């Protein structure tokens, strides 16, 4: 069963409040249980006097790839200073400075951090920066514009948080792509 965070709370009159429902959040891939929960929340808002209307974020499909390219590029750049000398974890046993750097990063960073550093380094490398990083920045700006437009007549947007219902902690860690796809509605 889905969580009921507002259960037992006294609700107030929401007359005059407009909430937007981004149409692109309710397409293929959204679990029926999640859809029903969001529609129930919209119904509750309507019942309290809020106006709920559809809005559009046509570039939403670009949000997730743009987010991962930009955040990975930033992580790659920011974590470059974690060398075990001045910043970050320091390996205990090493023969020289190169080994200190290598071991400190091997031991100090988890698999996901290493994955993001590699993706970010690739996205920022010469020959690929225009193809990935700069396009991701353009997509982010387009999404920002669309979100501002959608919020122009709304106090808030109501959308699912993730396509499937929540799974137990540690349940999907073996499939990074599935974990990444779970962020689709939270990155814009």
Residue ranges of model-derived segments:
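A short helix-breaking turn/cap at a secondary-structure junction
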Residues: 1-37, 41, 98-103
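Acidic-enriched catalytic cores of C-N bond-cleaving enzymes acting on peptides and small amides
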Residues: 1-4, 28-58, 80, 88-91
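Solvent-exposed alpha-helices and their adjacent loops that cap or buttress functional pockets
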Residues: 11-14, 20, 60, 109-111, ...
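Flexible, acidic loop-helix segments that line cofactor/substrate-binding pockets
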Residues: 17-18, 22-25, 55-68, 97, ...
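Flexible loop/turn segments at secondary-structure boundaries
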Residues: 26-30, 61-63, 125-126, 165-168
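Residue-level marker of alpha-helix boundaries and capping positions
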Residues: 29-33, 66, 176-179
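An alpha-helix initiation/capping motif
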Residues: 35-39, 61, 137, 141
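Glycine-rich, small-residue loops and helix-cap segments
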Residues: 44-47, 51-52, 71, 77, ...
């Amino acid at each position: 069963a889905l969580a009921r965070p507002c259960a037992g709370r006294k609700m107030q009159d929401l007359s005059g409040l407009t909430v937007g429902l981004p149409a692109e959040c309710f397409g293929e891939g959204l679990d029926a249980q999640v859809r029903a929960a969001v529609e129930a929340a919209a119904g509750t808002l309507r019942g309290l006097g809020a106006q709920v209307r559809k809005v559009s974020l046509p570039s939403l499909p670009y949000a997730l790839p743009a987010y991962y390219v930009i955040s990975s590029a930033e992580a790659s750049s920011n974590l470059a200073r974690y060398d075990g000398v001045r910043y970050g974890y320091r390996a205990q046993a090493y023969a020289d400075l190169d080994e200190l750097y290598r071991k400190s990063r091997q031991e100090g960073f988890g698999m996901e951090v290493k994955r993001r550093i590699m993706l970010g380094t690739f996205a920022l490398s010469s020959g690929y920066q225009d193809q990935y990083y700069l396009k991701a920045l353009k997509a982010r700006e387009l999404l920002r514009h669309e979100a501002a437009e959608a919020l122009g007549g709304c106090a808030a947007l109501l959308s699912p948080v993730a396509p499937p219902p929540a799974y137990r902690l540690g349940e999907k860690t073996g499939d990074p792509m599935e974990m990444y796809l779970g962020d689709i509605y939270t990155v814009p």
